[in-house]
């Protein structure tokens, strides 16, 4: 053991916590992320857990992981491989070691590497370190036993004490990165406010883990420190995408001066939006947990008709079920925000994994001519702005809007600067005015935008009926006239097509790139990182990442036709590439497609894009 520890200063580091589904790896990772964001580091996280409610203990399929990338400056992805791997049992080491760098430090709980544990993890010998050929530094500590020793006088039973193992590992990682434990203490006291004894037990164990590292130097000769660089002044917090989405909905309702209503049915990975909004009744938020997906959407449409900012949240299977109700919002031309947190499909598919396979469903997955704006969030923190933009678009253009996120984005988190709501654009719904009373009809439109005016129930002189049957363009009465139906289909389509959206920005070597990377939604960080890496290596690469998918930005064709080689990278089998080919004459891109349920790997992107450049 060295007398003094060397502190290595790093610009960035990746830590991966892994263990059984019940080992609390998500909580440990979240707390460490929260500490890092609070002290001023940028972060990007990736929770990775099985779909089982509780997989068999110690099994290879039941391993839960949480990876966080911490940077002194901006970070865009959770990282391809980790600098520190926490493996709380044999199965975690077996399945997660592939994510460790050759220079990584590995922390294991030796108490969970007994023969029965090794057998479950399919090890052939009693020395997994040797069997796997692990050459990295290994901190092998009897964590379970030390936790029981620490809490011996707590009065807790053995099972309850072992639930604190994750906090020992967290304390050890905090020591390794010279983190102050105060933030973790406050987090735990808030989380277990109704169970203070549990909070104090966990806090005691965190300190035990920290002290173990400090007093023994834990088999390593150095610790780390990730510096913080100057950021835009303000208050920062670690925020998940689902929470950011919820906050964006609340902010838009506040800006528009409307109550917020969410009708929803619980579904992975979107349920946290419902949970978060249910906490904010004091802000004028009403949430209804409905009996099914259709009801969730239908109640939201009713709330919209009554004058609320209405939303519904779901995932791909739920969008299938909501499609008829979403079409009701299309034909009645009522504002509605549909949040689709995409997951692996088809059918039940991969509930806890991520894909971008709902794009064409969002664009076209309804009967009839059913135009609907579609926005895709690029990152966890961007979800706030994307949700706000979706609400503004829905309210000002009297249309349902689909907001696409995905499992990777929704479950991940980032360091978020609390915004100044005053700086956000006003939201001005097209309400009827007093002078319209004498000649009001439900589908009276603004001649420039094609948007119908919004008359709320209870306004004298504006009584009207809406419904799912086609309406006369003048009177609002039910109509089956062929010419009228043709007109109404075109009016609804033109209204959406006229919605102004920002131009798509080209990053990197925008003027003279030899390759343009095109993507949308939650792949932004990985595509940007691949572009940066290639440009640092002397290549000329640019990135055009789309947020607005319908309508597309006005400069889309100009951007796509400017470069000799264009590759569309997406987590599906080519939906966005096909859509762009449909919209842009003569556009024939290269494609990079994966549907693994996992985020892109930056090194794999670089290899694939380099191969395209060399053709």
In which residue ranges do the predicted regions lie?
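Active-site cofactor/cluster-binding pocket
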Residues: 1-256
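Gly-rich Lys/Arg/Thr-decorated short loops/hinges at beta-loop-alpha junctions or inter-strand turns
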Residues: 12, 51-52, 149-151, 218-234, ...
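Thiamine diphosphate
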Residues: 12-100, 268-364, 373-395, 536
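Short glycine-rich or small-residue beta-strand-to-loop segments that form or flank ligand, phosphate
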Residues: 13-20, 169-171, 260-263, 310-313, ...
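A glycine-rich phosphate-binding loop feature that marks nucleotide/adenosyl-phosphate handling sites
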Residues: 49-50, 205, 226-230, 265-269, ...
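Short gly/pro/ser/thr-enriched loop/turn and capping motifs at secondary-structure boundaries
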Residues: 50-54, 113-117, 146, 294-296, ...
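Conserved thiamine diphosphate
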Residues: 79, 134-144, 353-402, 406, ...
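Flexible, low-complexity linker and terminal segments
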Residues: 239-248, 256, 391, 395-615
């Amino acid at each position: 053991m060295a007398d003094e520890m060397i502190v290595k200063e790093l610009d960035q580091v990746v830590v991966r916590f892994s263990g059984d589904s019940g080992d609390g790896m998500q909580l440990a990772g979240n707390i460490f992320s929260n500490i890092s964001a609070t002290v001023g580091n940028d972060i990007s996280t990736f929770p990775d857990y099985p779909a089982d409610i509780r997989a068999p203990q110690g099994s290879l399929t039941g391993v839960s992981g949480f990876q966080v990338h911490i940077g002194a400056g901006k970070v865009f992805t959770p990282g391809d491989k980790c600098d520190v791997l926490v493996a709380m049992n044999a199965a975690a080491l077996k399945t997660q070691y592939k994510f460790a760098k050759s220079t990584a430090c590995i922390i294991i709980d030796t108490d969970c590497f007994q023969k029965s544990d090794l057998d479950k993890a399919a090890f052939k010998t009693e020395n997994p370190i040797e069997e796997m050929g692990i050459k990295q530094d290994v901190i092998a500590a009897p964590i379970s036993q030390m936790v029981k020793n620490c809490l011996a006088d707590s009065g807790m039973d053995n099972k309850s004490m072992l639930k604190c193992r994750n906090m020992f590992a967290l304390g050890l990682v905090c020591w390794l990165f010279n983190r102050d434990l105060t933030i973790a203490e406050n987090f735990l006291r808030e989380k277990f406010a109704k169970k203070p004894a549990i909070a104090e037990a966990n806090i005691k164990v965190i300190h035990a883990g920290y002290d173990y590292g400090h007093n023994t130097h834990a088999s390593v000769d150095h610790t780390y420190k990730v510096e913080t660089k100057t950021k835009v002044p303000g208050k920062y917090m670690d925020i998940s995408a689902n929470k950011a989405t919820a906050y964006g909905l609340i902010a838009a309702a506040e800006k528009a001066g409307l109550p917020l209503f969410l009708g929803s049915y619980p579904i992975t990975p979107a349920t946290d939006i419902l949970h978060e909004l249910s906490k904010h009744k004091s802000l004028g938020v009403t949430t209804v947990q409905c009996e099914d997906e259709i009801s969730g959407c239908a109640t939201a449409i009713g709330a919209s008709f009554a004058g609320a900012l209405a939303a519904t949240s779901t995932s791909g299977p739920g969008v299938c079920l909501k499609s008829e109700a979403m079409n009701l919002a299309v034909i009645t031309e009522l504002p509605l925000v549909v949040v689709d947190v995409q997951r692996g499909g088809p059918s039940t598919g991969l509930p806890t994994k991520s894909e971008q396979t709902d794009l064409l469903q969002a664009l076209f997955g309804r009967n009839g001519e059913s135009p609907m704006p579609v926005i895709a969030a690029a990152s966890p923190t961007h979800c706030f702005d994307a949700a706000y933009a979706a609400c503004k678009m829905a309210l000002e253009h009297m249309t349902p809007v689909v907001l696409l996120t995905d499992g990777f984005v929704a479950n991940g988190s980032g360091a978020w600067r609390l915004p100044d709501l005053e700086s956000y654009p006003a939201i001005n719904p097209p309400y009827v005015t007093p002078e319209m009373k004498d000649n009001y009809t439900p589908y009276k439109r603004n001649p420039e935008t094609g948007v119908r005016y919004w008359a709320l129930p209870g306004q004298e002189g504006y009584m009207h009926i809406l419904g799912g049957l086609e309406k006369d363009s003048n009177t609002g009465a039910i109509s089956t006239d062929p010419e009228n139906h043709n007109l109404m289909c075109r009016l609804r389509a033109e209204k959406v097509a006229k919605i102004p959206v920002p131009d798509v920005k080209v990053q990197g070597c925008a003027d003279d790139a030899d390759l343009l990377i095109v993507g949308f939604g939650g792949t932004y960080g990985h595509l940007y990182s691949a572009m940066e890496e290639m440009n640092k290596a002397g290549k000329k690469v640019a990135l055009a990442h789309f947020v607005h998918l319908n309508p597309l930005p006005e400069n889309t064709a100009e951007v796509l036709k400017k470069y000799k080689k264009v590759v569309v990278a997406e987590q599906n089998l080519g939906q966005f590439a096909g859509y762009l080919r449909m919209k842009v004459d003569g556009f024939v891109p290269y494609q990079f497609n994966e549907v693994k349920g996992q985020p892109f790997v930056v090194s794999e992107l670089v290899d694939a894009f380099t191969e395209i450049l060399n053709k």
